[in-house]
């Protein structure tokens, strides 16, 4: 490099200036990792600032996202569309430089990081996606998918349990193109970490079957660059490069202390730091020669142009594969998807099978996985319960050399055994989705969505198409008892902005839920599915199911020639209960409409006219769902048949009676609501 020290100091200066101007932020990590960044971004990272979305770019993840001024400085200096004014607006409303990096806001940011440990886990997902796409699309002489995934991570990331889940899988999957650089500075918010972090990180990652390099001097760019070059030669293992660094490097009084972590250095300390670094330039001033040393636009454009030539040759030799690759990376569904979705829904409606909705999900998946090669499934050690596997998705396996094991038909596996790692699974799926080329889905019990929750939230924040298959959704799972019976989980998931939640009642609603989830380019989806069998609910019109709620049965459908006096709203397994209660009430000449509401989150986005059509004003509304009642009062319910306590261990049928989920109790609740109205 022309002047590696000045290049690193430019990062340090921008970091401390931006944090000082914002009066908020984390200067220490960017100052400590600046030399590591010079080595990676200056000598190894293959990227194009002119086109941040180049398909074959290396992916870079700043897992310790609080050090966001590192990546903002790098993006600005290397030539991305991130003007200096944006750095001056660090942490300000509507700027491109949020407190933590956000994908879709800042060009060049690959994932939203901040919750520690999830960035390295996203990176595992990205590296997995690269490996699987290379296996699927590369041909002899045509390596169109051939890039690395790099991650910077700190002490907090390796403390978080999710890093164990993800990095163990990375070793098992032999993700040799994943290279992580560990900013080992020994400091966290509470101070020196030695009293509470005694892991031998090197031995830990060796146990994960990683290639471990170091510890090395993280402030020697040449040493770091050499380590990266060595890591790129690895053919079977991911690599961890342990870089010993000093947080707040250059600050005479704050370096190596927690005071460098999460607050401005202060004007006096910044002046002292400038002097110590020999940085004679004012706030936000970068010399032209330093900009020139960092500028990656020409080199990046040349790399992409060279790849484009290779891709053109690939297109000529394999036109169908090339077209499929372009479609997949664009996130477009195939043209025949709409017809497959219609056929799948109609088939379910025609067969009218009585099956658990988890089985209904598998039936829908059989059609969708056959039609969509981008579907990449999995389960957290519950495949036989979640039913996430299909004939088109054999289990993913790797041979001793790290190659994807292919079936007799010559295809690689598309169903991942994540092991008992719900949080890791969820964040890996986020990384797969962020990389592009796949639509990931994964299964576990609904109760264990709590393990995954923050990664689900991150998927919603990042607007990623990730599908969660949550089975055993209620007390209907029976004898396993309250530890496994979901009570608050449906309501809790519905509270996450940007997450679509579906709790379908039968095979048709489940097929619709899957088709909507697959069509949602900018939303994750949670499917809440039953363990127990559910009878088919007869329907006349299928068109309104996708709107989240629809009129399932009117009084005339049970022999009454009068208008509805009340509305029963039900979801999932309770829809049959509502229909049974409707019949009981009809025997007493009480007319009731039954509304199936498989997705409250979808229905809530509908226009007022449709909402009033489904839930007319003036009629008492009674909601029925085996879970907490809080979320139902927003619909103006007169009563809710729900569960505001934990479950019990007993057969499902016994529990239904114990908690009042009988047709008789629902009918009595409706009668009581009508009596109160009088």
Please name every model-derived segment.
Residues 60-62, 110-112, 150-154, 213-214, ...:
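Short glycine-rich or small-residue beta-strand-to-loop segments that form or flank ligand, phosphate
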């Amino acid at each position: 490099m022309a002047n590696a020290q000045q290049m690193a100091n430019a990062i340090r200066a921008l970091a401390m200036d931006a944090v000082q101007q914002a009066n908020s932020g984390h200067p220490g990590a960017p100052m400590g990792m600046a030399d590591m960044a010079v080595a990676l971004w200056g000598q190894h990272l293959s990227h194009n600032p002119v086109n941040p979305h180049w398909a074959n770019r290396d992916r870079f993840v700043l897992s310790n996202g609080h050090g966001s001024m590192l990546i903002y400085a790098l993006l600005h200096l290397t030539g991305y569309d991130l003007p200096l004014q944006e750095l001056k607006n660090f942490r300000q409303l509507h700027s491109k430089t949020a407190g933590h990096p956000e994908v879709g806001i800042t060009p060049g940011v690959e994932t939203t990081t901040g919750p520690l440990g999830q960035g390295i886990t996203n990176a595992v997902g990205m590296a997995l996606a690269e490996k699987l796409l290379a296996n699927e699309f590369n041909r002899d002489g045509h390596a169109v998918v051939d890039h690395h995934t790099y991650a910077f991570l700190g002490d907090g990331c390796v403390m978080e349990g999710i890093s164990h889940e993800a990095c163990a899988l990375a070793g098992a999957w032999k993700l040799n193109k994943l290279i992580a650089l560990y900013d080992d500075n020994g400091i966290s918010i509470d101070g020196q970490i030695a009293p509470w972090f005694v892991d031998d990180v090197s031995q830990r990652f060796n146990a994960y079957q990683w290639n471990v390099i170091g510890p090395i001097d993280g402030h020697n760019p040449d040493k770091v660059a050499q380590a990266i070059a060595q890591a790129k030669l690895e053919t079977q293992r991911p690599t961890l490069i342990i870089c010993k660094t000093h947080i707040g490097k250059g600050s005479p009084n704050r370096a190596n202390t927690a005071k460098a972590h999460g607050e401005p250095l202060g004007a006096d300390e910044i002046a002292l730091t400038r002097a110590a670094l020999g940085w004679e330039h004012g706030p936000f001033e970068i010399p032209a020669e330093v900009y020139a040393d960092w500028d990656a636009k020409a080199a990046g454009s040349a790399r992409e142009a060279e790849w484009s030539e290779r891709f053109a040759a690939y297109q000529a030799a394999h036109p169908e594969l090339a077209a499929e690759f372009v479609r997949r990376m664009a996130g477009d569904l195939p043209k025949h998807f709409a017809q497959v979705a219609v056929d799948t829904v109609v088939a379910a409606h025609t067969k009218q099978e009585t099956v658990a909705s988890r089985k209904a999900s598998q039936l829908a998946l059989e059609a969708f996985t056959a039609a969509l090669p981008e579907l990449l499934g999995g389960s957290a050690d519950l495949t036989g319960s979640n039913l996430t596997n299909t004939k088109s998705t054999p289990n993913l396996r790797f041979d001793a050399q790290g190659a994807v094991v292919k079936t007799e038909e010559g295809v690689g596996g598309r169903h991942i055994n994540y092991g008992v790692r719900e949080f890791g699974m969820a964040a890996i799926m986020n990384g797969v989705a962020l990389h592009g080329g796949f639509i990931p889905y994964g299964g576990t019990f609904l109760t264990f969505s709590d393990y995954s929750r923050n990664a689900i939230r991150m998927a919603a924040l990042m607007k990623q198409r990730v599908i969660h298959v949550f089975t055993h959704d209620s007390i209907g799972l029976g004898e396993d008892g309250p530890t496994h019976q979901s009570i608050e989980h449906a309501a809790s998931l519905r509270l996450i902005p940007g997450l679509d939640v579906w709790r379908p009642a039968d095979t048709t609603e489940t097929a619709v839920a899957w088709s909507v989830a697959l069509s949602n380019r900018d939303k994750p989806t949670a499917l809440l599915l039953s363990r127990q069998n559910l009878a088919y609910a007869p329907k006349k019109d299928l068109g309104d199911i996708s709107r989240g709620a629809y009129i399932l049965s009117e009084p005339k459908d049970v022999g009454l020639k009068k208008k509805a006096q009340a509305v029963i709203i039900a979801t999932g397994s309770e829809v049959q209960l509502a229909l049974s209660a409707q019949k009981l009430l009809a025997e007493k000449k009480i007319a009731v409409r039954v509304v199936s509401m498989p997705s409250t989150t979808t229905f809530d986005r509908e226009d007022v006219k449709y909402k009033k059509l489904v839930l007319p004003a003036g009629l008492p509304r009674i909601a029925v769902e085996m879970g907490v009642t809080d979320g139902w009062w927003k619909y103006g319910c007169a009563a809710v048949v729900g569960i505001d306590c934990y479950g019990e261990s007993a057969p499902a049928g016994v529990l239904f009676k114990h908690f009042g989920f009988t047709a008789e109790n629902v009918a009595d609740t409706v009668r009581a609501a009508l009596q109160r109205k009088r």
